[in-house]
Amino acid sequence: MKVDKERLENTQPLRFTYRTENGQELFYYAFFPSIEPKGCVICIHGGGWTSDSAKRLFPQAAYFAEQGAVGVSIEYRLNSETTDVRNGLHDCVSAVKAIRKMLFERYGKEMPVVSFGDSAGGYYAVCLGNQKMVKRIDENMQIVDYVVDLNGIVDLTGKWSYGLSSKTQEDLQDYSPLFNVSAGDAPTLIMHGDQDKTVELEDAKRYSEALQKKGVSHDLKILAGAAHAFILFDYRHDNIFVGATLAWICDFLKGKQYI
């Protein structure tokens, strides 16, 4: 199926405030389907935790809505002198809770929620399906039903330690999904390009092994010839490839009955 990027870019979302922190409003942007949805896909942008915005994944969220799901793109606090990934994770947890509430109010039912994240956003997407990490933020938070991890960061103990202001080994491991997998975590689709020079493919394989050891259902799909951030339009790959990959993910989620 050909994905019409231009049409997706011309689709406008509804904006919702999900929390206010120190006077700063944080928003999520929702695209609604024309039919009764089976599920919701929450898209989380990358940018190394220091740049980019929710708008980056508007076309992807709009596509999920076009295919019958509620598509959402969320913003979160970027790292700064006073914030790190713990703040961003707190925001993402708050956003999921607010989105679930909105979905129930709008449709009168609960539905599967999928976290879909690219790179640094993949980190947050994975965290949202990880029981230990979510409970550190909110004891009452229910993890997402499924995770789509697109070349996501899973280990803060090496080159990605800058994501956390604390550099103690204990804290770095506590906020690394790789070291916090447990039985009952959300089933996961891991997708990683074999030409990724930003987040090492080996990290995806290590995470797959960690999930396997704990009996967490998952699929690891290695994309031949794909570089980092292969899901972004107008970036490293041509838009035909990006669209085909997005359509494949959508079909995969439909096959799993999440959307």
Question: Where are the language model's segments positioned?
Answer:
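N-terminal cap/lid segment of alpha/beta-hydrolase-fold proteins
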Residues: 1-36
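Active-site nucleophile elbow and catalytic-triad environment of alpha/beta-hydrolase enzymes
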Residues: 166-180, 185-186
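Conserved alpha/beta-hydrolase "acid-adjacent" motif
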Residues: 197-206
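Primarily recognizes the serine-hydrolase "nucleophile elbow" in alpha/beta-hydrolase
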Residues: 97-162, 172-173
